A protein has these predicted regions:
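Acidic/His- and Gly-rich active-site-bordering loop/insert found
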Residues: 17-171
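Intrinsically disordered, low-complexity Ser/Thr/Pro-rich tracts
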Residues: 9-10, 95, 99-109, 196, ...
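Aromatic-enriched hydrophobic runs in primary sequence
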Residues: 7-8, 27-32, 44, 48, ...
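Residue-level recognition of conserved structural "scaffold" positions that shape functional pockets
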Residues: 12, 89, 93, 124, ...
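A near-ubiquitous, low-amplitude feature marking generic local secondary-structure context
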Residues: 12-18, 42, 46, 65, ...
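Short, Lys/Arg-enriched N-terminal segments with co-localized hydrophobic residues
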Residues: 1-14
Length: 255
């Protein structure tokens, strides 16, 4: 869910909570998780692995299909940029009064918000020799051990991972245990894409301009090394990549 102003109302007090389709969001995550995008430590090129471009192309295509503006794929460096235009009108005089270089691209005087996530996944478990990823949903998790892979006898147990205890009754998305799921950060990618689609489908929700950026190679420390600052020119930016719901880190980045 997200919080946004209601269309037609003015002032920061006009807020509404919007609920996304959970099934659609889960399906989006599974679709992205199936694309192998493992980055590689010690490679000077960006992206460090060419497989990351497959997800970049998929996201570019989906952004165009949903109606996002200024969709740009940096094919060489594997960055994806897009814009969800703001719909809070402002007079030409107010726009012209802005001194920054973004004046002509602003649809309104609200701050431009940036949402970013990375497409690559960790190479902590090397899956390059068998890059097929098999995510699946577990509905209404019962709180017990989860058999991920019968053949390999791989189990996900609350005794080993106590955080599972908080997930009883919820829907889990897991793999077959032979690869990482890639929820870091394809969950963030899916959330941004779902939010973009929702806002484009609901023009009655008032919001400022939102810029989107998907990066390669965050897991090897090079996520923003080749970003285009003009394509991601924002007033405030949020990286959708973290732990529990409601967790927020600010003015700090140590990944």
């Amino acid at each position: 869910m997200i919080t946004a102003g209601k269309g037609g109302e003015k002032g920061s007090e006009a807020m509404a909570t919007l609920h996304f389709d959970k099934e659609q969001l889960a399906d989006r995550l599974i679709r992205y998780a199936k694309v192998f995008t493992q980055s590689k430590e010690g490679v000077n090129d960006t992206p460090s692995t060419p497989c990351q471009r497959e997800l970049a192309r998929l996201l570019t295509r989906e952004l165009k299909e949903m109606g996002a503006s200024d969709v740009v794929l940096d094919e060489e460096k594997c960055y994806v940029y897009a814009t969800i235009p703001g719909n809070i009108p402002a007079s030409k005089e107010k726009l012209d009064a802005r001194s920054d270089k973004e004046s002509k691209r602003r649809e309104n005087t609200a701050p431009i918000i940036g949402l970013a996530a990375h497409m690559d996944t960790s190479d902590a478990v090397d899956a390059s020799s068998h890059p097929e990823i098999h995510p699946r949903k577990i509905e209404n998790y019962d709180g017990g051990s989860i058999l991920l892979n019968e053949k390999e006898n791989i189990t996900l147990s609350p005794a080993e991972f106590p955080e599972l205890s908080d997930k009883k009754g919820k829907t889990l998305i897991v793999t077959d245990g032979t690869t990482v799921l890639g929820g870091d950060d394809k969950a963030g990618v899916a959330e941004i894409m779902e939010a973009a689609a929702f806002l484009l489908q609901h023009p009655e929700i008032a919001h400022g301009t939102i810029r989107i950026m998907f990066t390669p190679d965050e897991e090897v420390g090079n996520g923003t090394r080749n970003m285009n600052r003009d394509e991601f020119a924002v007033d405030y930016a949020y990286t959708v990549d973290g732990g529990g719901i409601g967790e927020l880190e600010y003015e700090n980045f140590n990944a």
